[in-house]
């Protein structure tokens, strides 16, 4: 069986963590790309030298030329400028749009058949731009947002209930930003919905509301603590989970930023936004359209409209 090739475009904190995690899971050989000379080569060599200790057989290489990603099965894009304290994800549109143009051309030329996972912020509009520039089919490109946001939601719920992370399921829909929609009604502990846990006296609605808001602010909380950058361990773990679902045809149900066609989820037109999907060897194999109540639908529409607003800004910058 041919070895899988995973290309990481961007060799910063997330890129380096991705490379390490991919090796530990032996998902395939890794090529790290970056425009900064020496960085992908150095990180690649460092991680390669850890493989005898870990007992994993993965090959690592670093490059500054897009030709190195030729034939990749999966491309994970983290290239771009991260947030600093006081910035919103949306402040990065103009800078990172130019990065997506270059990355998209690199993918189109060298690995148009790859499954593409975008992690660059502002997430939803960057996925739209990357698909526009790369020409990758909509089912083969996704944004990493909901997996991370749901993981943060689950983390805070685990802390509140003092239970195992394995027993908490949570869904976050919508754009990756302040308008994201953590769905309390569809989130459970061992199959018990959160509203029932309130009735059982495990928590209060007020505490759940605080957890929902902390989830929305999860990225900013870490940015403000780090002061010099943004989160990378949890985003990398989330990206690897998505890549693994594709490479192993796991048919996992994961919330990702994907192309939601007009008419789906009550949307008037097409928009890249976070919804649950099934990821397998065909990429996004289907969208899971869960039933939303009026309040949830209104929140989701608000989130999707925020993404549309950013896409409009991006189109203006593209001329």
Curated annotation (Swiss-Prot):
Known function: Catalyzes the reversible oxidation of malate to oxaloacetate.
GO terms of molecular function: L-lactate dehydrogenase activity; L-malate dehydrogenase (NAD+) activity
Keywords, alphabetical: NAD, Oxidoreductase, Tricarboxylic acid cycle
The protein's name in its UniProt record: Malate dehydrogenase
Gene3D superfamilies: Lactate dehydrogenase/glycoside hydrolase, family 4, C-terminal, NAD(P)-binding Rossmann-like Domain
UniProt GO BP: lactate metabolic process; tricarboxylic acid cycle
Reactions listed under catalytic activity: (S)-malate + NAD(+) = oxaloacetate + NADH + H(+)
HAMAP family in UniProt: Malate_dehydrog_3
Binding positions (NAD(+)): 10-15, 34, 96, 119-121
Family classification: Belongs to the LDH/MDH superfamily. MDH type 3 family.
Entry keyword Lipid metabolism: no
E.C. number(s) listed in UniProt: 1.1.1.37
């Amino acid at each position: 069986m041919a070895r899988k090739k995973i290309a990481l475009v961007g060799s910063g904190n997330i890129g380096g963590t991705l490379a390490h995690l991919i090796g530990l899971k032996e998902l395939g050989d890794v090529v790290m790309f970056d425009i900064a000379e020496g960085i992908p080569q150095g990180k690649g060599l460092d991680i390669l030298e850890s493989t005898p200790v870990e007992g994993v057989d993965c090959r690592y290489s670093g490059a500054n030329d897009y030709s190195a990603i030729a034939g990749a099965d999966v491309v994970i894009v983290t290239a771009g400028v991260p947030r600093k304290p006081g910035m919103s994800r949306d402040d990065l549109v103009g800078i990172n749009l130019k990065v997506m143009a270059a990355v998209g051309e690199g993918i189109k030329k060298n690995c148009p058949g790859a499954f593409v996972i975008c992690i660059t912020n502002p997430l939803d509009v960057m996925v739209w731009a990357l698909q526009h520039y790369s020409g990758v089919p909509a089912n083969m490109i996704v944004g990493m947002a909901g997996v991370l946001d749901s993981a943060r939601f689950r983390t805070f719920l685990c802390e509140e209930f003092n239970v195992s992370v394995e027993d908490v399921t949570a869904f976050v829909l919508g754009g990756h930003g302040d308008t994201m929609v953590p769905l309390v009604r569809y989130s459970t502990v061992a199959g018990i919905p959160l509203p029932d846990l309130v009735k059982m006296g495990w928590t209060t609605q007020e505490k759940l509301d605080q957890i929902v808001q902390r989830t929305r602010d999860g990225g900013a909380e870490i940015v403000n603590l780090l002061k010099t950058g943004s989160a990378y361990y949890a985003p990398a773990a989330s990206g690897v989970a998505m890549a693994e679902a594709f490479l192993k045809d796991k048919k996992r149900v994961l919330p990702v930023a994907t192309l939601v066609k007009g008419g789906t989820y009550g949307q008037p037109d097409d928009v890249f936004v976070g919804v649950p999907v099934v990821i397998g060897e065909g990429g996004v194999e289907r969208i899971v359209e869960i039933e939303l109540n009026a309040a949830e639908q209104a929140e989701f529409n608000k989130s999707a409209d925020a993404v549309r607003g950013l896409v409009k800004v991006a189109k203006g910058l593209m001329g």
